Amino acid sequence: EIAYLRARDLKLGAAMERIGPIHREVDPDLFSSVIHHIIGQQVSMAAQRTVWQRLQAAAGTLVPETVAAMPAEALQALGMTRRRALYILEFARKAASGDFDLDALAEMGDREVLARLTSLRGVGPWTAEMLLIFGLRRPDVVSWGDLAILRGMRMLYRKRSIGQRTFQRLRKRYSPYGTTASLYLWAIACGALPELT
């Protein structure tokens, strides 16, 4: 993957060389991964971590049946909005009843997974793409909706902005290892190469 990306994009390749290996943390438990990502939407990582730890403590075992049995008020009391609590409950109930087959996602192509996940209330394209990366370990995901990826691209290529056309050109250049490129773009956006800030 790294050798391929280095050969396809000299700027990204040089950045990868300087940054070194990046470990991708994955969560193979798709049920908890969906909930974790719903909790993390538009909140700080610290807030996400706090609410997540509270949910784990309150639920004990994080399985569909346990979460589906929790009252919305109990979820809300953990530090999330009522709407987010309702999204999580609806998802947990669908997973518990079998109306949403999480295991089937592993057998689907990326587009089908995105369509299936975004059919859930509270799961938009960005959340679904993060689940492809961190839950299903898909190799070729670069999210247009991820502001840090766009910032990493702007920094790396010294651009004022990244439009849809430029983004698509870069995404195709990174393919079939877009996920690895995404990890490095996130690192760049977070200051891994101070000279680019």
Question: Where do the language-model regions lie?
Answer:
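C-terminal accessory module of base-excision DNA glycosylases/AP lyases that mediates lesion recognition
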Residues: 1-22, 86, 110-112, 125-197
